[in-house]
């Protein structure tokens, strides 16, 4: 990359590290088939990306937003908040349901094993073969 190209870009993007991130993201987009906004002049994709930033054919803010969006794994969706009145009505119905469920006995059962059955099971275990791992 030509030093002149990087120095031209510093006027547009003040932080060199951010410039590298934006230019590399744009170069990847070009490699994936995005159309370029300047003449290629037999330059490679990173140089083309830097020249696009230097010539201001792309907005650094748009590139930054696109980079952030491409790195996000979970996109937040703004959902409308429910009405307080409907929440109060739903809360009363849920309280009635929970009172009915409290009256039901819990049916959790575990397998019961006597001490003799446990000892017989332990004696029947085969020890692992020794290895040189430890």
Swiss-Prot record:
Family: Belongs to the RNA polymerase subunit omega family.
Keyword field contains Membrane: no
Protein name: DNA-directed RNA polymerase subunit omega
Keywords assigned by UniProt, alphabetized: DNA-directed RNA polymerase, Nucleotidyltransferase, Transcription, Transferase
Entry-linked Gene3D superfamilies: 3.90.940.10
Organism the protein comes from: Rhizobium etli (strain ATCC 51251 / DSM 11541 / JCM 21823 / NBRC 15573 / CFN 42)
Region forming the signal peptide: none
Alphabetical list of Pfam families matching this protein: RNA_pol_Rpb6 (PF01192)
Catalytic activity reported: RNA(n) + a ribonucleoside 5'-triphosphate = RNA(n+1) + diphosphate
Gene name tied to this protein: rpoZ
């Amino acid at each position: 990359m030509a030093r002149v190209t990087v120095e031209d870009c510093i006027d547009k993007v003040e932080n060199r590290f951010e410039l590298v991130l934006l230019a590399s993201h744009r170069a990847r987009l070009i490699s994936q088939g995005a159309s370029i906004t300047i003449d290629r002049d037999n330059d490679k994709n990173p140089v083309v990306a830097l020249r696009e930033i230097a010539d201001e054919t792309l907005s650094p803010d748009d590139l930054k937003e696109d980079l952030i969006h491409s790195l996000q794994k979970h996109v937040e969706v703004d959902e409308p908040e429910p009405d307080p009145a409907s929440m109060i009505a739903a809360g009363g119905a849920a309280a009635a349901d929970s009172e009915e469920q409290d009256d039901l006995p819990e049916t959790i059962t575990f397998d019961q094993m006597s001490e003799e059955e446990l000892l017989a099971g332990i004696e029947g275990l085969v020890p692992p073969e020794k290895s040189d791992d430890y």
